[in-house]
A protein has these predicted regions:
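Conserved acidic residues
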Residues: 105
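A conserved beta-strand element that flanks and buttresses the S-adenosyl-L-methionine
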Residues: 108
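Class I (Rossmann-like) S-adenosyl-L-methionine-dependent methyltransferase catalytic domain
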Residues: 1-43, 47-102, 116-197
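Short catalytic micro-motifs in class I SAM-dependent methyltransferases
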Residues: 111, 115
Length: 197
């Protein structure tokens, strides 16, 4: 999971079961009903870029990052066919702080956190905090909310979410999403947080 080859293989074999074919319902509902402030937004683990492209259409300066070349190529191809202004880069999310320190007003997290090795979750939180401007927002839909089981996707609990993010982020809202992908219904948890420094 910590190597691009793992994800490339999944894309090449059609094992990308996380692919929705469009933006995440939880993101769409949140942006349509109470959008976070506009600005430059990072989308880590963007896959084929549907969420980043949706955010760009809604007036955000969206940049999608993914570990897998195939994902970035697919996202760029979709963007070329139907331009939204989103851009896509093949990057290791754990090293983004080197080039993007305090560069983003917001981050949208969905299915990236659950895909990484749980032993690297604290490192992920540090990486996300490093690319956000002081006071920047993190909107996340965490999945799967359950105990036990392997992955990816690796399970997480609401208490673990708070434990990992509270040292660097202030929680403003936490709630079940209005809509979920049917197979994920009851297993997702939305949070809106602010970087505390």
């Amino acid at each position: 999971m910590s190597h691009p080859a793992f994800w490339e293989d999944l894309y090449q074999r059609g094992g990308d079961g996380w692919e929705l074919g469009g933006p995440a319902p939880a993101l769409v509902d949140f942006v349509e009903t109470g959008p976070p402030p506009r600005g430059r937004v990072a989308v880590p683990g963007c896959g084929r870029g549907h969420d980043a492209r949706y955010l760009a259409r809604r007036g955000y300066g969206a940049v999608g990052f993914d570990f897998a070349d195939d994902a970035v190529r697919a996202a760029r191809a979709l963007e070329a066919q139907d331009p939204t202004g989103a851009s896509f880069e093949r990057r290791d999310i754990f090293t983004l702080g080197g080039d993007y320190a305090n560069a983003f007003d917001g981050v949208w997290e969905y299915t990236c956190f659950c895909a990484i090795d749980p032993a690297r979750r604290a490192e992920y939180v540090r990486a996300i905090a490093s690319i956000l401007k002081p006071g920047g927002w993190l909107l996340a839909c965490f999945y799967p909310i359950r105990r036990g089981g392997g992955g990816p996707p690796f399970p997480i609990s609401r208490s673990e979410i708070r434990r990992h993010f509270a040292p660097r982020f202030r929680f403003e809202r936490a709630f079940p999403p209005i809509r979920s992908v049917p197979r994920r219904s009851g297993q997702e948890w939305m949070v809106l947080t602010r970087k505390t420094y």
